[in-house]
Amino acid sequence: MSLTPGQFERAAAFEAHQQRLVQLQRMSYRELQQLLTGDPAEAALWVRSAAEYGVPAAQLRLGRMLLEGNGVERDERAAFTWFERAADGGDPEAMNMAGRCHENGWGVPMDFRKAAERYRASAEAGHDWGEYNLGNLLFDGRGVTQDVAAALRWYLRASHRGHGRAMNLAARCFEEGWGCAKSPAEAAEWYRRSAESGYFRAQFNYGVLLAELGDGAAAAEWFSKALSAGDDGVRQAVARVLEGAMDGALVALRGGLAAGRPSGTA
């Protein structure tokens, strides 16, 4: 019996898929990494084969490739489907990504309640982004009953895993007394740790704190680091803080900004 052109193409694709699966099983870790960091379109073929075979990590990666249009045509709906499959397979990062799809309306109608469910599953599995994102929904009361104290607890859990953004928000809670008693010492500690992790908003916040404590030199250093991120909002915020500053280091930084230097320094 002869095959139609369509049947022949499907048979050839299936055979190629099977061959890729066999080769994947024989690859060393180094060979696999070289494959995944090579040509995106070629990598997508291998990732799809592993995803269709049922490997949650591959399903997650394929979802990301589809969401970003990396090596494949961008398809938010297909990305969400693969995130869901990986999440159902127990992958905490995929649970978080499925939550992001629900929260942002990527490939699926926006639904904060479903986002919270996925974030909670991810958070309870110990994923830092799941903890952070669940904290945000709890803080704002989106999809869940607002609970700022619970939000802070999740921020702290993510912070202890090294999540820079969570550290910054935990610091803000301690600074303002949101969901906890005010604690300048805790706020300073978490702003510092977040700033040292490289998060530019925390670098600005820590700089403000240091300026208020009278350490203009250290404040100027952190402001300069924050400015290096190139965020217009932070640049405007730094400029406002520097208005009327008398400390020599802060005055010099203000002059650098006025001269158009991106980080305020030479």
Name the predicted role of every residue range:
Residues L24, D39, E52-V55, E68-N70, ...:
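Short helix-capping/linker turns of helical repeat alpha-solenoids
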